[in-house]
Amino acid sequence: MKNVTDSFVSLGHWSSAGSFGLNTDILATNPINLSVVLGVLIFFGKGVSDLLDNRKQRILSTIRNSEELRGRAIEQLEKARARLRKIGMEADEFRVNGYSEIEREKENLINATYNNLERLENFKNETIRFEEQRAINQVRQRVFQQALQGALGTLNSCLNSELHLRTISANIGMLGTIKEITD
């Protein structure tokens, strides 16, 4: 024990000449070093321990937050995938319905065009029949006029004034008979 106290006393006598000396006395140097290290650990250990605890809590808090964010991100990813699948199915459905709608519209357009062509064909046929009938009537009228003119020409060339007077008298006589019958 005397050596320990002597080593503390000898600390005060060291010269500050700037040179380090090698103390080979193990018993004198180890307790001093140990006491300094223990003192530093005890003095600064509480602060370091608190600092490490705070750091540990921040790291754990960051890990928990990261795990929560990861969980939310995974959840959002699953929702997005489900929505993408749903939208994909709806797109396929719209595509199929669109194609069937296009086919239906195409069929309706073809049917409407066919009906229009059929109506136009009927109208054309009616117009042709009407024009044929009109042409036939014009030909009949022309033939009748020509026949009438021919008959009048024949009558005028064959009639003389005596035949003409007899025809007029016969017609007047027929009119008189008709008048008597009706009265």
Curated annotation (Swiss-Prot):
Keywords on record: ATP synthesis, CF(0), Chloroplast, Hydrogen ion transport, Ion transport, Membrane, Plastid, Thylakoid, Transmembrane, Transmembrane helix, Transport
Subcellular location: Plastid, Chloroplast thylakoid membrane
Alphabetized InterPro entries for the sequence: ATP_synth_b/b'su_bac/chlpt
Topology with respect to the bilayer: Single-pass membrane protein
Keyword Thylakoid recorded: yes
Keyword Thylakoid: yes
Gene Ontology CC annotation, any one: proton-transporting ATP synthase complex
Primary residence: plastid
Transmembrane annotation, as ranges: 26-48
GO MF annotation, one: proton-transporting ATP synthase activity, rotational mechanism
Description of how the protein assembles with itself and partners: F-type ATPases have 2 components, F(1) - the catalytic core - and F(0) - the membrane proton channel. F(1) has five subunits: alpha(3), beta(3), gamma(1), delta(1), epsilon(1). F(0) has four main subunits: a(1), b(1), b'(1) and c(10-14). The alpha and beta chains form an alternating ring which encloses part of the gamma chain. F(1) is attached to F(0) by a central stalk formed by the gamma and epsilon chains, while a peripheral stalk is formed by the delta, b and b' chains.
HAMAP family per UniProt: ATP_synth_b_bprime
Function: F(1)F(0) ATP synthase produces ATP from ADP in the presence of a proton or sodium gradient. F-type ATPases consist of two structural domains, F(1) containing the extramembraneous catalytic core and F(0) containing the membrane proton channel, linked together by a central stalk and a peripheral stalk. During catalysis, ATP synthesis in the catalytic domain of F(1) is coupled via a rotary mechanism of the central stalk subunits to proton translocation. Component of the F(0) channel, it forms part of the peripheral stalk, linking F(1) to F(0).
Other remarks in the entry: In plastids the F-type ATPase is also known as CF(1)CF(0).
Family: Belongs to the ATPase B chain family.
Listed name of the protein: ATP synthase subunit b, chloroplastic
Record organism: Drimys granadensis
